[in-house]
Amino acid sequence: MKISTILFFCLLMTACMQTKSFHRINGWYYVTSQTTDSLSLTPFLTVKDFDTLRLETDAFGHSVITGVFLQNKSPIWREATKKSIGKRIAFVFNDTVITAPLINIPLESGHFQISNPHGYDLERIFKAVSYTHLRAHETTLHL
C-alpha cells in the first residue's frame, strides 16, 4: 500500500512538472488577443520570405533590423497588415516575441522594421536571421 501510494505521488509530481513546449517558426504572427500565448498557430510570413535584410540605426541611435519581403510575398504582407489595422502583429525569434507593433495602416511596400523595445540583442538576432535567410535562398537556388 505504501509503495503504491508513493509511486502514485511520484507519477503525479512528474506529470505536473512537465511543461508543454511548442516551437514557433521564426517569423511574423497575428496577435489573436491580449491573453497569454495569443499568437496564431502558424506565421503568415517567415524569415525565409525575406528578400533583403539590414542592421541599421534609427533616429534615436538604437539598432533596428529593416527588411523587404520577396516580391511574391509582399501581397501577403499587405493583406496581413490590412487585416490587422488597430491590432498588433508579432515578430517571433527563437520562440520569443521580439516586437509586436500596432498596425495603423496597411503596409503596401513589403518593407518592415524590427525594433527593440525589450532590450534584445538585435545584432545577434540579425546575424542568426541573416544566416537562416541565406541558407533558405541557397537551397532554392540549387533546386
PLM features: residue spans?
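Positively charged n-region of N-terminal signal peptides that target proteins for export
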Residues: M1-T5
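C-terminal motif of bacterial Sec signal peptides marking the signal peptidase cleavage site
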Residues: T14-A15
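Extracytoplasmic
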Residues: T19-S109
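Structured soluble/peripheral alpha/beta segments that form catalytic or ligand/cofactor-binding pockets
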Residues: P101, I105-S130
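Conserved small/polar residues in nucleotide/adenosyl-binding loops
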Residues: T132-T139
